[in-house]
């Protein structure tokens, strides 16, 4: 296990900057997921930790030792790639033990560690097979076994599940998590898949355009996104966002001519300002003729475990989770009630979160009081 410290790390390709002064610290034994869209710099950062990319400026330290000038083999890291990169002419056992063979580990010791590692990842019965005779999930296990056998201080995962089908991704997520609990090694996992991020991470790093947008526990980030980017990137469907002006007298914001109530403290703090308001689809309350903002149904997604209605409000699409008892179809008029306690506020100019007396836990507690009256 090793702590990783990233200090003001920048990366440029010629005159094109890719990473803009990244500052991060990962605790020893922590499982960190770096999440972001394609091109955000997450894989570049991982490759810089591994030593596969040069650092333009800044420092990376592993276990208290600055590794900027160290070769990849000297950093104590093992990497698992999206592409398994197995030797097709070698058996599973030979693939797993190849690094030990190159390092000159005696044959008996090498065989013992191959068998122990194969047992950890459930490949004991496949050691004599070639990669072509394995499923995608089994090949990924070989790739992980090849990393485990080196007994590294740090595991680096670069989108290792992207080539697997949906069912295999679920089972491999569980295997990776159990593996981490067993080995307790510091692990950094890069992905663009928010489900992988939410289910695997002890701590989540959200990146966008070479910058770190937010760092925290996955649920903290989900419930308190630091920006409109995080709010729209985390969650499926994404958070509903609309920009409007705060009315003090009501107190409310107006959406398509309909007031959406605010707590008085919120209205006073934000009075007269344009704000971007957000609410998660599962926190909208949908009815056919109840209170709320009128909307026209565009389409309904049947997910088996639930249903999502997508509706038009003044030319903007809003999403809301609905139960099986509410039957709606395209073209129908519905009403979306947006509970005060679940509203989020952002600065339209910067996209950054605005904290007020009427948001988050304070708002929820006040809402419970209002409902009790």
Swiss-Prot record:
InterPro entries: AAA+_ATPase, ABC_transporter-like_ATP-bd, ABC_transporter-like_CS, ABC_transpr_MalK-like, ABC_transpr_MalK/UgpC-like, Mo/tungstate-bd_C_term_dom, NA-bd_OB-fold, OB_MalK-like. Its main location: membrane. It is found in: Cell inner membrane. GO terms for cellular component: ATP-binding cassette (ABC) transporter complex, substrate-binding subunit-containing. Residues 4-234 form the ABC transporter domain. Its EC number is 7.6.2.10. GO terms for molecular function: ABC-type glycerol-3-phosphate transporter activity; ATP binding; ATP hydrolysis activity. It is a peripheral membrane protein. It catalyses: sn-glycerol 3-phosphate(out) + ATP + H2O = sn-glycerol 3-phosphate(in) + ADP + phosphate + H(+). ATP binds at residues 36-43. One of its GO terms (biological process) is carbohydrate transport. Pfam families: ABC_tran (PF00005), OB_MalK (PF17912). It comes from the Bacteria. Gene3D superfamilies: 2.40.50.100, Nucleic acid-binding proteins (2.40.50.140), P-loop containing nucleotide triphosphate hydrolases (3.40.50.300). It is an enzyme of class 7 (translocase). Keywords: ATP-binding, Cell inner membrane, Cell membrane, Membrane, Nucleotide-binding, Sugar transport, Translocase, Transport. The complex is composed of two ATP-binding proteins (UgpC), two transmembrane proteins (UgpA and UgpE) and a solute-binding protein (UgpB). Part of the ABC transporter complex UgpBAEC involved in sn-glycerol-3-phosphate (G3P) import. Responsible for energy coupling to the transport system. PANTHER family: MALTODEXTRIN IMPORT ATP-BINDING PROTEIN MSMX, OSMOPROTECTIVE COMPOUNDS UPTAKE ATP-BINDING PROTEIN GGTA. Belongs to the ABC transporter superfamily. sn-glycerol-3-phosphate importer (TC 3.A.1.1.3) family. This is sn-glycerol-3-phosphate import ATP-binding protein UgpC 2. It comes from Agrobacterium fabrum (strain C58 / ATCC 33970).
């Amino acid at each position: 296990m090793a702590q990783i410290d990233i200090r003001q790390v920048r990366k440029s390709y010629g005159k094109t900057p890719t990473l803009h002064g990244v500052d991060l610290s990962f605790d020893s034994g922590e499982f960190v997921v770096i999440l972001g869209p394609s091109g955000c710099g997450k894989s570049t950062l991982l490759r810089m930790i591994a030593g596969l990319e040069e650092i333009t400026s800044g420092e990376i330290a592993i276990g208290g030792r600055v590794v900027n000038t160290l070769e990849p083999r000297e950093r104590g890291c093992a990497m698992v790639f999206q592409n398994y990169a197995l030797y097709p002419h070698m058996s599973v056992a030979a693939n797993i033990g190849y690094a030990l063979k190159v390092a000159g580990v005696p044959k008996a010791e090498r065989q013992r560690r191959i068998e122990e590692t194969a047992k950890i990842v459930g490949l004991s019965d496949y050691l004599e097979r070639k990669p072509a005779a394995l499923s995608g999930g089994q090949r990924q296990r070989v790739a992980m076994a090849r990393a485990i056998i080196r007994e590294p201080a740090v595991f680096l995962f670069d989108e290792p599940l992207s080539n697997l089908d949906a069912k295999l991704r679920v089972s491999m997520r569980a295997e990776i998590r159990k593996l981490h609990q067993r080995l307790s090694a510091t692990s950094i996992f890069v992905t663009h898949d928010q489900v992988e991020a939410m289910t695997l991470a002890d701590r989540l790093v959200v990146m966008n355009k070479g910058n770190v947008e937010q760092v925290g526990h996955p649920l903290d980030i989900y419930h308190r996104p630091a920006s409109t980017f995080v709010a729209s990137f985390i969650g499926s469907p994404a958070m509903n966002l609309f920009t409007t002006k705060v009315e003090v007298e009501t107190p409310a914001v107006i959406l398509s001519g309909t007031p959406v109530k605010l707590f008085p403290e919120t209205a006073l703090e934000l009075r007269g300002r344009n704000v971007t308001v957000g609410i998660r689809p599962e926190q909208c309350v949908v009815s056919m003729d109840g209170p709320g903002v009128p909307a026209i149904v565009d389409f309904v997604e049947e997910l088996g475990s639930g249903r999502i209605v997508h509706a038009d409000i003044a030319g903007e699409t809003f999403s809301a989770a609905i139960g099986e008892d509410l039957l709606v179809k395209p073209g129908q008029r519905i009403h979306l009630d947006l509970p005060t306690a679940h509203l989020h506020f952002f600065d339209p100019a910067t996209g950054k979160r605005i904290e007020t007396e009427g948001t988050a836990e304070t708002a929820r507690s006040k809402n419970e009081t209002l409902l009790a009256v």
